[in-house]
């Protein structure tokens, strides 16, 4: 099997992968907002069951740290807006990226509170609590490492509920602490809940990548339990009222999108009910509700949870909750993508440029795979040397396919040639290529990361398509330099147009991935020449001899 036929095999595998990726995206299209007005069916016992209403009619307060800019509604204490000052909305933009939003076009909120029989967020006890705050704006001052935002509410029975947001410098994890003071004569039965709700359909101003099959990533809900470390839950599944309803001791619930996530992490010794819910009007929710605790008369009860609202930074997320870092979705090749990213990050700590880091890691990967590459070309050279014998065999045996197959296998065995030896190394390279693709699409560190010249964002496609064209040129040179025994006219035509086909495919791929492929091709050309010279010295003619 020669190099061009191997390239054809890899091309077919690659195209198959992209078709599968597009099919996964389109087979269950997201329901439109106007189509999701059916009656809401939710998990039994969930906060959504109890009808956590929209906040409304409260005062909006501002809470700012060096990395978070939150807007909290005093009606219920929900986070209705979250801006991330360290992450621009767009390249060269002065506007921060907005993760949580409350507008007529789009809803994405982090709700939380106290429910249960005596909880102030239980609709049976009246409207959601209207908390009192000392001021309208809280700002983390210079030299200050922690910012506390206390909110208090006293019900008609004189019971006092305090909800305190605790934010730390440089941290995207927000602790939410509750204190319940029982002023009555009967125990209070209280449960905590945390809920994330979001519009299923993105408005046009936020839908910037779903039309590009090469840049499509998962957007939806997810959860983790001790038994299931990481499970995704699609919005369209929630819209169909096929809802989650499980009990878990520990774990978390989350909503994910490319590079960013929100998550509620409950902190208690009991079990929690994890649920999803179709809230109607095109809004999906995922949340948790804790087991009720009793606060005795004259006593104070303390409960707490953590809200992650920010970028998917793996090491920081892992420190907040077990397996929260798995929300950095590297797909089914995570076991390759994760070590690749760790190596890339380590290289970046020295060179300071993600583009040059990709170039270096390409040399490392190709160096590690050099023995396989050498085996590939050696096997191809041996196969080429056998072609005259195989051709004579075909002429001698005619149409007796069984005899031809038997004698060919005997010939391969006698000459110690593996007919698949040229294909196997290429098959090994395919998972690495796909793992790098997942890594580039899932690592927030590479978002808006510049390289050089006109490449200002390695996670986005080349705006001028120069890199894909260069990639096609390198493929063309590899094809011309490689030996071929392809005689089938159709295969010859396919191979002729393969660089063009790949160039068109790569027009929409992240620049970092195209850069990897260009450097990989250049290294292949160098390795190819070195291996060919060694084979010629051994009498293995890997290429056509020039006619004198």
Swiss-Prot record:
The protein's topology relative to the membrane is: Multi-pass membrane protein
Q: Transmembrane stretches, by residue range?
A: 6-26, 350-370, 420-440, 458-478, 499-519
Biological process (GO), any one: protein transport
Region described as Disordered: spans on this chain: 28-55
**Classification via Pfam families:** 60KD_IMP, YidC_periplas
Q: Which GO terms fall under molecular function for this chain's record?
A: membrane insertase activity
Q: What is its main location?
A: membrane
Q: Name one GO cellular component term.
A: plasma membrane
Location in the cell reads: Cell inner membrane
Q: Where is the composition biased (Low complexity)?
A: 30-50
What does the UniProt function comment say about this protein? Answer: Required for the insertion and/or proper folding and/or complex formation of integral membrane proteins into the membrane. Involved in integration of membrane proteins that insert both dependently and independently of the Sec translocase complex, as well as at least some lipoproteins. Aids folding of multispanning membrane proteins.
Family membership, please give it.
Belongs to the OXA1/ALB3/YidC family. Type 1 subfamily.
What interactions and quaternary structure are annotated?
Interacts with the Sec translocase complex via SecD. Specifically interacts with transmembrane segments of nascent integral membrane proteins during membrane integration.
Q: What is this protein called?
A: Membrane protein insertase YidC
Gene for this protein? yidC
């Amino acid at each position: 099997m020669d190099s061009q036929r191997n390239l054809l095999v890899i091309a077919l595998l690659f195209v198959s992968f992209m078709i599968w990726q597009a099919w996964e995206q389109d087979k269950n299209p997201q329901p439109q907002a106007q189509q999701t007005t059916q009656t809401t069916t939710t998990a039994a016992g969930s906060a959504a069951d109890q009808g956590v209403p929209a906040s409304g009619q409260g005062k909006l307060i501002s809470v700012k740290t060096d990395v978070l800019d939150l807007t909290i509604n005093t009606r219920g204490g929900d986070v209705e807006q979250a801006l991330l000052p360290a992450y621009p909305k767009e390249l060269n933009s002065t506007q921060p990226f907005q993760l949580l939003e409350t507008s007529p076009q789009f809803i994405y909120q982090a709700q939380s509170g106290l429910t249960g029989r005596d909880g102030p967020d239980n609709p049976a006890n009246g409207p959601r609590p209207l908390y009192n705050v000392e001021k309208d704006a809280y700002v983390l001052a210079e030299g200050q490492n922690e910012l506390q935002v206390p909110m208090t509410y006293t019900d008609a029975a004189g019971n006092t509920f305090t909800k305190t947001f605790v934010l730390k410098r440089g941290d995207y994890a927000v602790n939410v602490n509750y204190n319940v003071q029982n002023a009555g004569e009967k125990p209070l039965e209280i449960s905590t809940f945390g809920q994330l709700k979001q519009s299923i359909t993105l408005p046009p101003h936020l839908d910037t990548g779903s039309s590009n099959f090469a840049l499509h990533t998962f957007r939806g809900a997810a959860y983790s339990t001790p038994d299931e470390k990481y499970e995704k839950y699609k919005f369209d599944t929630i819209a169909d009222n096929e809802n989650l309803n499980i009990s878990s001791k520990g774990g978390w619930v989350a909503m994910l999108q490319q590079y960013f996530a929100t998550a509620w992490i409950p902190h208690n010794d009991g079990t929690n009910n994890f649920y999803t819910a179709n809230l109607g009007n095109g809004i999906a929710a995922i949340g948790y509700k804790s087991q009720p605790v009793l606060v005795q008369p004259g006593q104070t009860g303390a409960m707490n949870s953590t809200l992650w609202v920010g970028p998917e930074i793996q090491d920081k997320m892992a420190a907040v909750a077990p397996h929260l870092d798995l929300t950095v979705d590297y797909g089914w090749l995570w076991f390759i993508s994760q070590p690749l990213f760790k190596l890339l990050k380590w290289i970046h700590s020295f060179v300071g440029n993600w583009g040059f880091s990709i170039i270096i890691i390409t040399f490392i990967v190709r160096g590690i795979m050099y023995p396989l590459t050498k085996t590939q070309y050696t096997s191809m050279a041996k196969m080429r040397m056998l072609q005259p014998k195989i051709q004579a065999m075909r002429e001698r045996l005619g149409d007796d396919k069984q005899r031809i197959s038997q004698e060919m296998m005997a010939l391969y065995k006698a000459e110690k040639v593996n007919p698949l030896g040229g294909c196997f190394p290429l098959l090994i390279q395919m998972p690495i290529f796909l793992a790098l693709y997942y890594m580039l699409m899932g690592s927030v560190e590479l978002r808006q990361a510049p390289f050089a010249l006109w490449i200002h964002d390695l996670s986005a496609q080349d705006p001028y398509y120069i890199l894909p064209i260069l990639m096609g040129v390198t493929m063309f040179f590899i094809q011309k330099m490689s030996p071929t025994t392809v005689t089938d006219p159709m295969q010859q035509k396919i191979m002729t147009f393969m660089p063009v086909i790949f160039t068109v495919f790569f027009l929409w791929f992240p620049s970092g991935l195209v850069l990897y492929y260009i450097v990989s091709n250049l290294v292949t050309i160098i390795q190819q020449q070195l291996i060919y010279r060694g084979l010629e010295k051994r009498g293995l003619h890997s290429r056509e001899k020039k006619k004198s």
